[in-house]
Design a protein with these regions (language model features):
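Short helix-initiation/N-cap motifs at beta->coil->alpha
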Residues: 53, 76-87, 184, 207-219
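Extracytoplasmic small-molecule ligand-binding "clamshell" domains
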Residues: 56-58, 73-88, 93-100
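Metal- and O2-centered redox machinery and metal/ROS homeostasis
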Residues: 42-45, 64, 71-72, 94-96, ...
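Contiguous mixed-secondary-structure segments that line small-molecule binding/active-site clefts
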Residues: 102-194, 198, 202-212, 227, ...
Length: 319
């Protein structure tokens, strides 16, 4: 499965390097919407994912873990948004996919910003209850992985230090001097820009540039075409000391921990599925996920290879 696709949420960038590399479509059999089965005679499972690097990696790791246990795996990775994924679950196109607790809370449950739980435990509790109690298509959100992938407001470390910007309060006070590189979904989602401005009312950027490719947002920072950008805390790019995530001291966002959402009917037929999925998620943490994302986005390694190497080293699958 080749990593050669422009990814809406997590395009890659070599900071200080040659910029964005060329991109073509992912191989259909490996990562597209209609990936074929693995050819096993075991129980069937269809694994989906959304359309960015971390999601595709998580989906690929789930797929490889199931294949290692003898399942006949169909990959339907890179499908679309959380709404697309939720519909795919409900109509039986997929059996499971990785979601984020906070994303489900905001986008699937439709909860407003003022109701966001302040703890991951409460976020997960409410989301898991919602999925379990669905009348037509009961599902389970399983135990989350032990890391969060939240929004990250990012600046060049040099710029932030020169302007004494460490927190979003600091940023808001000086925002009229700064250009913000955002993306359409963040500007429109209830947990996005309006939520940030509500909690930090002095926020008033000199200019907001809408850039829907994450890699180009990082490129804009590197080339001083923007002063502030919106990223995600497990982006591979953030391993660079040249970048600084500005602290959110008011905890304005829900908790975004990845966890599999699985059809109850699939779990009923395959009681070992929970253990398989949990073995993948518990092999991860924020540093490991950031490293894996970076291997795909920055080093241009294949999804399959990155997933396999990690799972073998973690003892999740046999080498």
């Amino acid at each position: 499965m080749k990593n050669k696709m422009m990814l809406n949420r997590r395009d890659f960038l070599r900071l200080g390097g040659a910029g964005l590399a060329g991109a073509t479509l992912l191989g259909v059999a490996g990562c597209g919407g209609g990936g074929g089965g693995s050819g096993s005679s075991g129980p069937k499972v269809s694994v989906g994912s959304k359309k960015f690097t971390e999601q595709i990696l998580l989906g690929e790791m789930y797929a490889q873990a199931f294949a290692d246990k003898g399942y006949d795996v169909t990959r339907k990775l890179n499908l679309g948004s959380e709404q697309v994924m939720d519909k795919a679950l409900q109509d039986g196109t997929i059996d499971l996919y990785p979601e984020y607790t906070g994303t489900a809370y905001v986008a699937i449950l439709g909860k407003p910003p003022e109701s966001y739980p302040k703890t991951e435990k409460e976020t997960y509790k409410q989301v898991a209850k919602f999925y379990k109690n669905r009348k037509d298509t009961p599902m389970q959100m399983l135990k989350p992985a032990p890391f969060e992938n939240n929004y990250g407001i990012v600046m060049l470390t040099k710029t932030a230090n020169e302007m004494n910007i460490d927190t979003l309060n600091d940023l808001a006070a000086k925002s009229d001097q700064l250009v913000f590189s955002s993306y359409s979904e963040f500007q429109n989602r209830s947990d996005g820009y309006d939520n940030m401005k509500e909690h930090y009312p002095k926020l008033d950027f000199k200019e907001i540039k809408i850039v829907n490719d994450l890699g180009i947002r990082y490129k804009a920072l590197a080339e001083n075409e923007a002063d502030v950008g919106i990223g995600f805390t497990t982006d591979g790019q953030l391993a660079s000391p040249k970048l600084k995530v500005i602290k959110d001291t008011k905890v304005i966002w829900p908790k975004y921990y990845p966890a599999p959402v699985v059809l109850q009917s699939f779990l009923d037929k395959n009681p070992d599925a929970k253990k398989i999925l949990n073995s993948v998620d518990q092999s991860l943490n924020a540093d490991v996920m950031r490293k894996l994302n970076g291997q795909v986005d920055l080093e241009q390694r294949d999804y399959e290879d990155v997933a396999r190497d990690h799972l073998e080293q973690a003892g999740v699958i046999n080498g």
